[in-house]
Curated annotation (Swiss-Prot):
This is Nucleoside diphosphate kinase. ATP binds at K11, F59, R87, T93, R104, N114. Major role in the synthesis of nucleoside triphosphates other than ATP. The ATP gamma phosphate is transferred to the NDP beta phosphate via a ping-pong mechanism, using a phosphorylated active-site intermediate. Pfam families: NDK. It is an enzyme of class 2 (transferase). Its EC number is 2.7.4.6. Gene3D superfamilies: Nucleoside diphosphate kinase-like domain. GO terms for molecular function: ATP binding; metal ion binding; nucleoside diphosphate kinase activity. It comes from the Bacteria. Homotetramer. Belongs to the NDK family.
Length: 142
C-alpha cells in the first residue's frame, strides 16, 4: 500500500452547515491524517484559477460563483491510498447517487452544492496541494 497525499476542500455549503468536525472525524477514523489546513474565502480569481480545467464547461461560472459564496476549509490529507480512500468517503458527485453513509449523501444538497472536493489522481493532487499550500513538500512518505 502506498502512502499518498490528496487535497480536500470542504465547500461553502458544508461549512455553512457547521459539519467541518464531522467530516474531519470521517477522515481520521478512516486512516487519513490532516497534515495541513486552512480556512479561507476564495476570491473569484483563486476559484477560477483552481478550476481552470473546467473553464470551457457550461457549469464553470456557476462553480466559481458557488466556491466564492462563503468560506471553505482546505486540507491536505495523508494516508494509505489517500486519493482513492478520500473519494470513497466523499461518494458520488451527485449526492442523490451517493452511497448511504458517504459525506455527500449525508451533507450535500445537490450536484452543485455537493459539500466536498477531492483530488482524482496523484498528478492532480500534487498540483492542487501546491496551489493552496505553496512550498509544501508533496512527495508522500517523507
Amino acid at each position: 500500500m502506498a502512502i499518498e497525499r490528496t487535497l480536500s476542500i470542504i465547500k461553502p455549503d458544508a461549512v455553512a452547515k457547521n459539519v467541518i468536525g464531522k467530516i474531519y472525524s470521517r477522515f481520521e477514523s478512516n486512516g487519513l491524517k490532516v497534515i495541513a489546513a486552512r480556512m479561507t474565502w476564495l476570491s473569484e480569481q483563486e476559484a477560477g484559477q483552481f478550476y481552470s480545467v473546467h473553464k470551457e464547461r457550461p457549469f464553470f461560472k456557476d462553480l466559481v460563483s458557488f466556491m466564492t459564496s462563503g468560506p471553505v476549509m482546505i486540507q491536505a490529507l495523508e494516508g494509505e491510498n489517500a486519493i482513492a480512500k478520500n473519494r470513497e468517503l466523499m461518494g458520488a458527485t451527485d449526492p442523490k447517487k451517493a452511497d448511504a453513509g458517504t459525506i455527500r449523501a449525508d451533507f450535500a444538497e445537490s450536484i452543485d452544492a455537493n459539500a466536498v472536493h477531492g483530488s482524482d489522481a496523484p498528478e492532480t493532487a500534487a498540483v492542487e496541494i501546491a496551489f493552496f499550500f505553496p512550498g509544501m513538500n508533496t512527495y508522500a512518505g517523507r
